[in-house]
Amino acid sequence: MGQTVTTPLSLTLEHWEDVQRIASNQSVDVKKRRWVTFCSAEWPTFGVGWPQDGTFNLDIILQVKSKVFSPGPHGHPDQVPYIVTWEAIAYEPPPWVKPFVSPKLSPSPTAPILPSGPSTQPPPRSALYPALTPSIKPRPSKPQVLSDNGGPLIDLLSEDPPPYGGQGLSSSDGDGDREEATSTSEIPAPSPIVSRLRGKRDPPAADSTTSRAFPLRLGGNGQLQYWPFSSSDLYNWKNNNPSFSEDPGKLTALIESVLTTHQPTWDDCQQLLGTLLTGEEKQRVLLEARKAVRGNDGRPTQLPNEVDAAFPLERPDWDYTTQRGRNHLVLYRQLLLAGLQNAGRSPTNLAKVKGITQGPNESPSAFLERLKEAYRRYTPYDPEDPGQETNVSMSFIWQSAPDIGRKLERLEDLKSKTLGDLVREAERIFNKRETPEEREERVRRETEEKEERRRAEEEQKEKERDRRRHREMSKLLATVVSGQRQDRQGGERRRPQLDKDQCAYCKEKGHWAKDCPKKPRGPRGPRPQTSLLTLDDQGGQGQEPPPEPRITLTVGGQPVTFLVDTGAQHSVLTQNPGPLSDRSAWVQGATGGKRYRWTTDRKVHLATGKVTHSFLHVPDCPYPLLGRDLLTKLKAQIHFEGSGAQVVGPKGQPLQVLTLNLEDEYRLYETSAEPEVSPGSTWLSDFPQAWAETGGMGLAVRQAPLIIPLKATSTPVSIKQYPMSQEAKLGIKPHIQRLLDQGILVPCQSPWNTPLLPVKKPGTNDYRPVQDLREVNKRVEDIHPTVPNPYNLLSGLPPSHRWYTVLDLKDAFFCLRLHPTSQPLFAFEWRDPGMGISGQLTWTRLPQGFKNSPTLFDEALHRDLADFRIQHPDLILLQYVDDILLAATSELDCQQGTRALLLTLGNLGYRASAKKAQLCQKQVKYLGYLLKEGQRWLTEARKETVMGQPTPKTPRQLREFLGTAGFCRLWIPGFAEMAAPLYPLTKTGTLFNWGPDQQKAYQEIKQALLTAPALGLPDLTKPFELFVDEKQGYAKGVLTQKLGPWRRPVAYLSKKLDPVAAGWPPCLRMVAAIAVLRKDAGKLTMGQPLVILAPHAVEALVKQPPDRWLSNARMTHYQAMLLDTDRVQFGPVVALNPATLLPLPEEGAPHDCLEILAETHGTRPDLTDQPIPDADHTWYTDGSSFLQEGQRKAGAAVTTETEVIWARALPAGTSAQRAELIALTQALKMAEGKRLNVYTDSRYAFATAHIHGEIYRRRGLLTSEGREIKNKSEILALLKALFLPKRLSIIHCLGHQKGDSAEARGNRLADQAAREAAIKTPPDTSTLLIEDSTPYTPAYFHYTETDLKKLRELGATYNQSKGYWVFQGKPVMPDQFVFELLDSLHRLTHLGYQKMKALLDRGESPYYMLNRDKTLQYVADSCTVCAQVNASKAKIGAGVRVRGHRPGSHWEIDFTEVKPGLYGYKYLLVFVDTFSGWVEAFPTKRETARVVSKKLLEEIFPRFGMPQVLGSDNGPAFTSQVSQSVADLLGIDWKLHCAYRPQSSGQVERMNRTIKETLTKLTLAAGTRDWVLLLPLALYRARNTPGPHGLTPYEILYGAPPPLVNFHDPDMSELTNSPSLQAHLQALQTVQREIWKPLAEAYRDQLDQPVIPHPFRIGDSVWVRRHQTKNLEPRWKGPYTVLLTTPTALKVDGISAWIHAAHVKAATTPPIKPSWRVQRSQNPLKIRLTRGAP
């Protein structure tokens, strides 16, 4: 056996607990891993001889320590605890280290080295820690070793440290029994960071060039002594205090205490700052400290010498043994503290202060301390400053707990309260709070009281309900329903009427029933409670009924107990069963008759079959009754046995009745499925863990909790819970309770919150909770969905497997757990006082509604079932999320596989629903399909769902229909072609216009669903055949597989081709159709071999495609898809049946696709690209487009070799391609009827004429994206011009040739002519427009009789050779052509008559336009767009306003706004008397009808009497019901003026302007903004301003000018001789009579002046101005028909208000040829209408 080598490192690791104890004694903490790392990897790199296995050599340890404690960036502060611990182990070795440490030699006693004078050499400088320069003192010639007095050098019994020395320092150990003194040259200088251990262990060191300065303390003998900082103290200060940036106050206080207690030197201050501050923080502190240096005058100084003397950055030469040196050090510390305080001031952030709030259980005193600390930390304010007490007090009140803050705000004389008073009051409130135990007791007591009250109320209601039920049941004698009143009356039996003195008991007279002697006396026995008394068929009272037979049935998903009542003619429901019909019937009972309604017809599944039945709805019936109607349909048999009555069917089986809702009626069409797993089935008992009914909630045991990753920028979202009805809350409460009990929901506190949405289940009163997780889904990372596609999922099911098992996992998502870190994402609010829940709940399992839940569960279940698939390779297992399909070839294999699957699911923790299970059957339903015998069918339920949808009325309903029907498109041949008319209506912004085409397509899709065939399941072991056909741009096909000699369809495919492919010839369209359907068929064939059969030779086309039709990209795509010989093969050309898309038995006529394509490649068959030998002309065309002076110029030219035939400038911005097309088209036009060779150097124009033009035309000139191609009009013009020449050859030549051939000369001349035309000739857009529009050439002109008559009047001549009329040397354009041209031009420009006329005059048209000006005016006037937008030029003459005949009878009112609104007055209510012009104005704060009524009744009526007429605009204050009601009660005729017509209220509107102008001038003159104060002056000015008749309103009203007082005339004696009051009134009456009468006559004369009426008449069409137009909205609306008129206004059809004539303009309508003639008859009330023109 070998021996292990023990090293210092391994020794420490073996005794690690002792190492940790030693480190703890040094106040540090060490970790084993870092201990090994530093010892073996870090310290050996220091270059001091440290071995990788460690050492206990003290010299090496001290050298490593000096490296660790190095100042600046070269130090290692993180290694301080570890080297200090190594040092402690070496100095005081524990027992397990002593054998490895050499014994220490006892040092010889030597005398300590006394301080010596400083060196004359300059001290060495350091960037961060400059050396201290010792003071220069005379060096003694001979050092004194012994003292003069002969005393001992050091008191060995003293515990004081040795005296402070300049060069050396003697150290003593802790016991004081030894002393050491060595020279400074023997040991290197220690690091700046020192510790108390050095006083015991470090050998003394001294530098001949520096002096050491240490923290000073005064010893017992009066000498300064050095006490260095401990490394553990520095380490603890660093780690146990926040950083300076985080909390500068706390660190400043710490440094201040250290400076006060330790009195550090300059070096130790640097050491302290370097340890506690970062580099940036230290620089900031030093800078602030230097700013605080003050000069001789006591103010901060910036003199460098004074700043450096007081606060040096390098080590100063201060002598700390002198008072002056110590004073320097004290000043340095003070400045350092000032720098710390100034650097620690953070910017003001009151938001942080406001964020400090009192905690629920925090005392006010503690809260106040936190608040003050926030003030100190985030603001420059001192919270202890008396000036800041108010701010602190307000923050304390507002940010206290709500209950404390509210009570503090209500304190009396709050301003006089000090902060201490507020704290004491808050403490008193805080101490009076309820304790948690008291609060819990109070809540418990209130809950118990509430529960007691609820229980008492329920008991009372139950008792009342029992009494009412017994009372009604005892009174009910029969339930008879009759549709006829006479039957009801005939069947009644009335109680015999009693006389007044007749006994009701014995029927004798003379006494009443209570005094009857025959009535038995004694205690009353218990009254028998009969629940129902029945009648026989004749209505007589039967004997006492037997025990009541009851049957529990399912109605609308809810169990309902029916009472079998053979006396009830009809069955009765007591609760609302859904919609009721309009039919009703009388129900006669003991208490009388009452009418009740019937329910709508319901499909009821009885034991005898399906029937339609309607129940009678009787809410006050005590029980639902099963009457004779349903008993008859049931063929029920009632047996009376000893145990009671039993109701059974005709075969003796128990009866069950199911009532369905209307939306579930489609299920009645389904065939009867195999019975589900019954509770007594062996499947349940054999596999109890696999079923949700017996195994409880599932839990996937092999799946780890899921962690939901968030997006990088996601932040928590909190959405409040929506209001929830009480019914909905009670509906979801049981579900929440169940989930809480199962642990799926747990209480939580989360920053996330999303609302809970209760969704009512159809046909029931039950609710289910649904959480709205849309906002959470936005913030969660997306994962790639791996859920299988239902479209091709069944492709993996071979037809040979015909035994199926279908399982539906219940609550599947709840089987997966959520990680606790992800659970808060799905929190929601829930409050239930009964359960003691008020807060948030969250999910511990994967929730529903989360976007990634299906993918996560599908992947987890796939992983768990992987072993099952491996162990059962003969079985087919398909999984779609939580729906599982198991298929086998035989029944035995299916049963064994099902058992194994159930066992596996149970062991894995998944639970299946027994109610939905379909076990070992040959026919099952899976994913909406019916699987049977290797085929899949559309279920009848799916068909009925589509058939039951009503005709769509909106795009959304149409999308729903197409989505539902699109699910079934595999069963519908040509579905895309059928639905083509419907898809355009689903686009956004399209008008939903449902026409005959849409209705036809809608019905065809429904009809196709009814005849949907069965499709075979894809068999991946057999090849597939794809039959493809194409028709009008729609690809149709059927995917088949051979089944014996027949072809069985697998899927019907259809799709619309893109616009480019739809424009190809039929053979190429077939290629595109095959490519499209091949891609869709690949989803079902899963890459298996495919044979394509089509009525075209597609393979040859794909191998040699015509490059003129296909682009390179399409060609490559088709070849890669269709020439894959391993997967795609082409069969022989076959003819297909259009109905079935299968081949016809007879052979079709073959055709050559390549030959057909060659024939259809161009537009003109004789068009060639070779020169014609006998051509009449050989021309050269060219188009040029270039930039000149920042503008793109363009031109086109047609030339020969030597001369220019045609050259024209084109509009700026024309492209070169367009110019080439225009030039080529012009050449073809000029060569009409001739043989032409035309050369062009444009590949674009050449290819368009020869190849692409026909392609563009076939596909409707659209691109592949469905947009119009560029240069559409030029391409169409070129295609039409190609047929004009007799023979034509378009030849391509190279551009810019330099040879001397005829081709080169002609091309150069054409290019030069095009450039010169573009530069010299201005573009003529009008001529260009006419020339480019081929229909407007003379060859197309057709003249009418009216045109010919006009031409003869003008004296025009007819050109026989050219076939058109000529006038003034120009061809004459007919009137109809002129109208079409000008109408097109106006629709392009929408210019007015004058602008269009000037444009045509300047353009010098080559044609004479017949009736141009008249047609132009008509086109401009009849344009609807211009009429809606253009302003009206019509001017309406001024009208006449009606005035009053005396003052105060007729007023005009209006509100005007005056800003700024002082004292809340923003409005001015102005009254103007129309007779005198007198004005009354009242400042108001609101513009309301209440203000108007108040001023009218309180101001106008008492002073001027009741007005007769009031006039105003249509403001809400005047049109409101309040104002109008007041006017009606007072008999005032309130006239509302036309809307948006200020002139109608001109007098008051002008007064508003006058008052505002006057107030503006007065405010400027007075220098105040108080317009309310200046309003009387403005009114005085308005009332005393002369009007149109030279009189002021004051003079008209009072008959004299206002009295004026001359304040400068002291003699007031003239005023004393005033006449009597009576005489003054008589004079006033005379003056008023003389003034008012002439004034009223003047007003009356104005009314008699004729007013020019507006030109509108009844029946005219007018446009009405839109007064409030939005952006890009026309300013006129209409046109409207005029119904009534006045001289200034009119009323139109469709607008209730009168409209001023200035707000309308005439609408020009195109003339309509009259088709009816109106004739008068003799009867004035009759007219005769006759068809046809008069």
Curated annotation (Swiss-Prot):
Annotated Mg(2+) 2 binding sites: D1182, E1220, D1241, D1311
SUPFAM superfamilies: Acid proteases, DNA/RNA polymerases, Retroviral matrix proteins, Retrovirus capsid protein, N-terminal core domain, Retrovirus zinc finger-like domains, Ribonuclease H-like
Motif annotated as PTAP/PSAP motif, chain positions: 109-112
Example GO BP: viral genome integration into host DNA
Note on how the cofactor is bound: The RT polymerase active site binds 2 magnesium ions.
Site features described as Cleavage, chain residue numbers: Y129, P130, F214, P215, L477, A478, L533, T534, L658, T659, L1329, I1330
Sorted UniProt keywords: Aspartyl protease, Capsid protein, Coiled coil, DNA integration, DNA recombination, DNA-binding, DNA-directed DNA polymerase, Endonuclease, Eukaryotic host gene expression shutoff by virus, Eukaryotic host translation shutoff by virus, Host cell membrane, Host cytoplasm, Host endosome, Host gene expression shutoff by virus, Host membrane, Host-virus interaction, Hydrolase, Lipoprotein, Magnesium, Membrane, Metal-binding, Multifunctional enzyme, Myristate, Nuclease, Nucleotidyltransferase, Phosphoprotein, Protease, RNA suppression of termination, RNA-binding, RNA-directed DNA polymerase, Transferase, Ubl conjugation, Viral genome integration, Viral matrix protein, Viral nucleoprotein, Virion, Virus entry into host cell, Zinc, Zinc-finger
Domain Integrase catalytic: 1443-1601
UniProt modified residues of type Phosphoserine: S191
Domain of life, per lineage: Viruses
Any one of the GO CC terms: viral nucleocapsid
Positions of region (Interaction with host PIAS4): 344-392
PANTHER family associated with the record: GAG_P30 DOMAIN-CONTAINING PROTEIN
Name this polypeptide is given: Gag-Pol polyprotein
Species in which this protein is naturally found: AKV murine leukemia virus (AKR (endogenous) murine leukemia virus)
